[in-house]
A protein has these predicted regions:
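Bacterial Sec-dependent N-terminal signal peptides
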Residues: 1-25, 427
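Hydrophobic alpha-helical membrane context
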Residues: 15-16, 84, 346, 445, ...
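Phosphate-group recognition and catalysis centered on beta-loop-alpha active-site segments
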Residues: 425-672
Length: 672
């Protein structure tokens, strides 16, 4: 979230035709930039403080609590080499007396940018501190009832990155100066970072990269105007700077950090407006496709905001119920989690579902996600009603939630908002049966990789134990005439899957699992000929999940080195004995019984924490789904491929659906 998704040097190698300046279409985004060209910075655009306007609350309702998520304030970027490139190339041109007055001016401005950057990437600038101080002051005077008449306690947590911590200090410091009797609880740490600033998703990034790579090829750049603007002899300048697009991109990078460094000049004036539009477009489309509810990735992106949403809801409910007394919960993080949050809520404008091309024309990036972007949820109550209302402010502007009916203006029933959030994304998850093997071999490394790339919650695969004790991945016990369980690994390994892969081992499979921590490995342990063989299979599987020992670690750090994240796995089996043994030996893992002949209550009493039954079982015993959930157990239905059955299992509320058709299941689960 801190660095841009794409290296611009690679971008310019893959762009389309270089031509003279083209006409710029009249779109909402273009009009937005013409109104204020500095907005072309997108997520490095400094905050615009606009006049505050409030719609009156329903009669008798007063604010009593604020839930807030704020992006850090203006910071330096990661463009040091770009700033130096512009400065040094123009300095060489100056030595050859090639600069126009505009070129000379740009040379000096780029030098200032480079000096202010000072090799410090991602550092909060003084402007960033001022932004949060001003936001705090505006919040304080806008909702005085929350701070002056209510509880004096404020809880604030921050991402672990310094620019967020300093932003938090700037915000809370101003509140303290305005009202010294406020009581602050400030904190930061990895457990907060996990939901404040959840990491990127490699599957989403790869899909976005492919879409943008194709889009770049359609772009036509003006490569002539910049030479006429900056140089007295364009032909000589071309010898010095042969790649006009890369050079202009470096100028664009200088321009987009002028606001954070309080440079008043509009540095975009050195570039053709059409090129500014395209640089801006490529910059924000990456964020939109990766972080918002786009038609390309929305179904993958929104679930990643759920933990943050759930945290904010639980904090608010604790205050509403009286269990906790607080005036406000303040959270300081980053742009990408912020975008995921406001899109999950479905706030008007920012959460529109667009294709790449539609977003390029219509999505207003710096309006939604400048530096210090913020969401404020203002809670209201009345002495005459138990109904709590909430108003959403996005960058201090009242925001509507089109999916819900408002009580009045931008005021919504909190219970309606919670219900909307509860149903915003499907609670039923997709498990690819034997991997996503359409076009691949079942139970192959390729099918696992495809399930990961598709964004499946989990990928199921089958494990047999060879005669010499090696766990291998294959559905049937036999490969032709070869019985896996009575054959040596060497003989099993000699066989090839339909796609040419050798029969994989569990260790090889888990190696691919480790490359994508988002997708659960659903390990089906096949029944063996004896209980002793089943115990051996359990032992070998648990061994495969142990992290590799750290090497060359000083003794005093040995305990820390062993604290590695456990593998994200689910165990399933038709063998009741295997499930019992797994539950006994690995109580921290999810274990699901497959046979379908035992009621949830009995399994729960044995310590087995899940059921994974054929969907036909749930037609006979639909009550088992709720029974399992009441006991805190998970419920999976297998193997569900037809629309009617998928809809039925979804409506029953199963937690996972195992399927050979992940595309159809996703389509049905996300029907909007």
């Amino acid at each position: 979230m801190m660095k841009r998704f794409f290296t611009w040097a690679l971008l310019v190698l893959s762009v389309g035709t270089a031509v003279a300046q083209n006409a710029v279409p009249d779109t909402p985004v273009v009009r937005f930039l013409r109104e204020n060209p500095r907005r072309a910075a997108f997520n490095t655009h400094s905050y615009e403080f606009l006049p505050i306007q409030d719609t009156p609350a329903p009669k008798g309702y007063k604010p009593f609590y604020i839930s807030h998520y704020g992006r850090h304030g203006s910071r330096s970027d990661w463009g040091g080499p770009q700033y130096r490139l512009v400065r040094d190339l123009l300095a060489k041109a100056s030595e050859q007396h090639l600069l126009t007055p505009a070129g000379d001016s740009l040379m000096h401005e780029a030098a200032v940018i480079y000096e202010l950057h000072n090799g410090m990437d991602g550092r909060l600038t003084p402007r960033g501190v001022r932004e949060h101080a001003q936001l705090a002051e505006r919040m304080y005077h806008r909702f005085p009832e929350v701070f002056r008449k209510g509880c004096k306690h404020i809880r604030a947590v921050s991402s672990t990155t310094p620019r967020c911590i300093v932003s938090m200090n700037g915000f809370t410091g101003r509140l303290m100066s305005l009202q010294p009797d406020l009581d602050f609880d400030l904190d930061t740490g990895e457990k907060y970072y996990a939901y404040i600033a959840r990491g990127e998703n490699s599957t989403i990034s790869a899909r976005t990269g492919q879409a943008l790579a194709a889009y770049r090829k359609t772009i036509q750049w003006d490569t002539e105007t910049v030479y006429r603007t900056l140089f007295t002899d364009p032909a000589e300048a071309r010898k010095l700077i042969p790649d006009a697009v890369a050079f202009q991109n470096a100028i664009y990078d200088c321009a987009r950090v002028s606001d954070p460094f309080d440079i008043p000049d509009n540095m975009y004036r050195y570039l053709p407006f059409g090129n500014v539009v395209k640089f801006h477009e490529l910059n924000f489309l990456s964020a939109y496709l990766n972080q918002c509810d786009s038609k390309l990735n929305g179904e993958l992106r929104l679930p990643r905001a759920q933990e943050l949403i759930d945290t904010l809801i639980s904090q608010a409910d604790a205050v509403i119920s009286g269990k906790v007394r607080k005036a406000a919960d303040l959270c300081f993080g980053h742009d990408w989690p912020y975008l995921g949050l406001v899109c999950y809520l479905g706030l008007e404008g920012v959460s529109e579902r667009y294709t790449l091309e539609e977003a390029a024309d219509n999505w207003l990036p710096s309006w939604y996600c400048p530096f210090a972007a913020n969401l404020q949820m203002i809670f209201y109550r009345s002495k005459k009603s138990d109904e709590v209302l909430v108003k959403f402010l996005m960058n201090e502007r009242e925001a509507k939630l089109p999916a819900l009916e408002a009580v009045q203006g931008p005021y919504y029933r909190w219970n309606d908002v919670k219900a909307w959030c509860e149903n915003r994304i499907p609670r039923t998850q997709i498990v690819a049966h034997r991997g996503y093997w359409d076009g691949n071999a079942e139970n192959s490394i390729a099918s696992l990789r495809k399930a990961q790339e598709f964004g499946c919650w989990g990928s199921e695969f089958d494990i047999h134990l060879t005669a010499d004790g090696v766990p291998v991945i294959h559905h049937d016990r036999h490969i032709g005439e070869l019985d896996i369980q009575t054959s040596a690994f060497e003989d099993v390994r000699a066989n090839r899957l339909a796609n040419g892969e050798p029969v994989p081992t569990l260790a090889e499979y888990m190696g691919q699992v480790a490359r994508n921590r988002e997708c659960m490995a659903v390990l089906e342990l096949k029944p063996q000929s004896t209980a002793e063989r089943e115990d051996e299979l359990v032992e070998k599987c648990l061994q495969a999940l142990q992290p590799a020992p750290a090497r060359n670690v000083p003794p005093e750090f040995a305990a820390f080195a062993r604290r590695q994240e456990p593998a994200k796995v689910v165990f399933i089996s038709f063998s009741h004995h295997i499930c019992q043994e797994l539950s006994r030996r690995a109580p921290g893992y999810m274990v699901q019984y497959l046979e379908g002949d035992i009621a949830p209550a009995q399994l729960h009493a044995e310590g087995i924490n899940g059921i994974d039954y054929h969907y036909s079982v749930f037609y006979k015993h639909p009550e088992w789904v709720q029974e399992a959930h009441d006991l805190g157990m998970t419920v999976n239905a297998w193997t569900v491929d037809d629309r009617k059955d998928i809809e039925a299992m979804r409506d029953l509320g199963v937690d996972q659906i195992t399927t050979n058709n992940p595309v159809l299941v996703r389509e049905i689960l996300w029907e909007r």
